[in-house]
Amino acid sequence: KNFDVDFIYHIIDFEKPIHSNKNLFNKPVYLVALIDHRKNINKIMSDIKEYIELNPMYLDKLLVCPKIYLNSFQPAGEWPTVPSLSAYYKAAKSYFPQVRIFSGMVTNFTELNRKRPDGDFDGINFSFTPIVHDASDYGVLDTPNSLEYIMNTVETFSNDTPVHIGPITLGMHFNPYGEKLADNLNKIRLEMAENDPRHDSLLSLSWSVAVFSQIISKNTEYVTFASMKGVHGIFTDDNQKRPLCYLYELLLYFKNSKIFKTKKIKSIFGLKFLMNEEIFYLLANSSTNQQVMTLDEKLLTRQSHLNESNFSKINDNNFSFFNFEDSGNDFSFEPYEIKLIKVK
């Protein structure tokens, strides 16, 4: 699928043999290199350079992260002996002077906060998943409330550089707190699992809107949500759209607009888009209760919606968030309902 994305988030484990995949890259690449901290830093950079030569790409951003930091270490506990992160960043800038060198962790904010970057860097990185402590629906939908604190904290040590958050998915990509991701053969709501049964659900879309609204900050410049295919994908293996695809198409449509987060009202998270002198609101009810809200603007509006009544047939009815109907200023939200509102 030819999605108009700005970059490809591409993670490679350099502790394993590297290989060629010349058909992979048609966009700027954000390469995340998981490396062996016991290896000579110059040899690490040579390995990365060799990989890029095997896989011709426009390398736009690079994060070099010791693979051992996929594990979580307690602040007062024993930490591994690893070269300073600044040594990796300095070497990366020397080998790749035209590339933006990112700092941070591949895993969650907890690990980033415990191992803050040092030295010079061009951006900062962490990911976000909701099923660390509580995989219940309530636990998942409560996690966006933590993001304002997280973003404010990151701002204190980001050196005022751009922030990349991602991947942002219900299921986990790595388990910093155990030997491996939890097996979830029965596809239940399970902490630390890679596959989450709600990935293709309306809850997943509503949660994604809530998360996106809360990571908006002056330095939030890059966001990676899902994969194209696979467990965290937005397409099936035969290229059919999965539900999250409709939301990501919408977010990509607004990528060049001015984006603001709206004040949370009850359980309704939202975003305001200003584009070509037009105003749009993307709002999501993150609760199991029906909610009612009124927009401040005393203007005529049009709306589209996605709730349980039309979600089950999302692929059958040529659904689009841009199929608007006239509406007023009072809006009723079903559980997990998402609305796109256009102010006329």
Stretch-by-stretch model annotation:
Residues 317-344:
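C-terminal beta-strand-rich structural cap/linker in extracellular carbohydrate-active enzymes
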Residues 1-32, 51-59:
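Catalytic domains of carbohydrate-active enzymes, especially glycoside hydrolases
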Residues 5-10, 27-33, 60-64, 101-105, ...:
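Hydrophobic faces of well-ordered beta-strands that scaffold small-molecule active sites
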Residues 20, 41-48, 109-119:
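Distinct, well-ordered alpha-helical segments
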Residues 164-246, 263-264, 269:
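Aromatic/acidic polysaccharide-binding cleft in carbohydrate-active enzymes
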Residues 35, 75-201:
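Noncatalytic carbohydrate-binding groove/subsite architecture in carbohydrate-active enzymes
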